[in-house]
Amino acid sequence: MKYDIIVVGSGPGGYVAAIRASQLGRKVALVERAEAGGVCLNWGCIPTKALLKSAQVYTYCKSAEHYGLTLAGEVCPDPEKIVARSRGVAETMSKGVAFLLKKNNIDLIQGFGRLTAAGRLEVDGTHYEADHIILATGARPREMAFMPI
């Protein structure tokens, strides 16, 4: 299939680029190997912030008297529920990204994208062409011998 633009990676850089290109009248596809929204939205930034919010609320409850409040009973964190809430937040946001892609007529291609030539991409055995390919795959930390993490 031929597109004007194919974006590889659906994180904050990728899905925003795809949406903007579509809004400008381009035929766009977005390739993602996992859930829409990428690592940041599904496993990094967003779930971490949800976990931190639970810790913040717990801290507020523990210091309720400083705010003129008396809580009846003990405030106890439930790790399973805290993690479930974090996963739920990430899932909701991922579905939101998928909705925005659909709303903007962007083809979401699930799979691992691999450049094969200029303007050509292969995703799990299927070949695609585009006038432009945007690589928005993010990064992974890498340990170097002279600078261990």
Positions of PLM-derived features:
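Beta1/beta-strand and adjacent pyrophosphate-binding region of the FAD-binding site
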Residues: 1-13
